[in-house]
Every structure is written in C-alpha cells, then in structure tokens.
Amino acid sequence: MKKGTVLNSELSALISRLGHTDSVTVGDAGLPVPDGIQRIDLALTHGIPRFMQVIETMTAEMQVERAVLAQEMVEANPDIHRQLVTWLQRLAQTQGNAIHIDYVSHGQFKALSGESKAIVRSGECSPYANVLLYAGVTF
C-alpha cells in the first residue's frame, strides 16, 4: 500500500506527471468539465470532501508556483477565499518560493480550466470554490 499523502491512484498519477507550468483545476461540485479534459471525481456527497481538504492534500505532493482564482470568489465566497489565500501563503513559505495569485472573471476561469491536465472535482457546494494550480519545480 502506498505510504504517501495522496492515496487516490488517478490523483497521484496526475501529480507525478506534471511538468513545469502545467495546470490542474480543483473545483467545486458544480464546475463544468470540458470535453477532452480528464475528470478526477472525488465528490462523495454534498460537502465531502471539502474544497480545502482537496487543496491541502494535493499540495502536500505538488510544487505550486501560481494560482488563478475567479475574482467573483472574493465577494461571493469570502471564507473559502480567505482560507485558500492563507493556505497558499503558508505553502509558499514551506516550499521556499513565491506563489503568484492572479484573478480573472469566472468566464475566463472556465476557459483556462479547459487547458488543465485535469479537473479535480471536490464535494464543495459553495460558490466559486475553484482554483487553477500551476506546477513549479523543486529545484
């Protein structure tokens, strides 16, 4: 049995295949997945797993250099926004690099998610609980 943090085989494989600047979208239960994009569906029921549980688990094994959020998240979901930004700041300290955070419209976000290697669906049922994570390098 795998001893690392990520036990889901699809998610573990995805993270191990990421190259520099590749992106992965982590989304709420309602984020659409464009045709041709891998869907890794972790949702069990409403709220399980939570968005931040997925983020915390993934970033334990993924080097992150950039994050893109929908600007609508700031007002429509301030609690998740605060938790995510705080987590990314802590992650940057742990990794020893800056993580740039960019904001785009939700429409632009959905278009960018179509360029992701995969969209990871959480069970989160709150508005705009989505982020694009861009892979960095560990050296």
From Swiss-Prot:
Pathway: Carbohydrate metabolism; D-ribose degradation; D-ribose 5-phosphate from beta-D-ribopyranose: step 1/2. GO terms for biological process: D-ribose catabolic process. The active site is at H20 (proton donor). GO terms for cellular component: cytosol. The keyword Isomerase applies. One of its GO terms (molecular function) is intramolecular lyase activity. Substrate binds at D28, H106, Y128, A129, N130. It catalyses: beta-D-ribopyranose = beta-D-ribofuranose. Belongs to the RbsD / FucU family. RbsD subfamily. Homodecamer. This is D-ribose pyranase. It comes from Edwardsiella ictaluri (strain 93-146). The lineage of its organism: Bacteria, Pseudomonadati, Pseudomonadota, Gammaproteobacteria, Enterobacterales. The gene is rbsD.
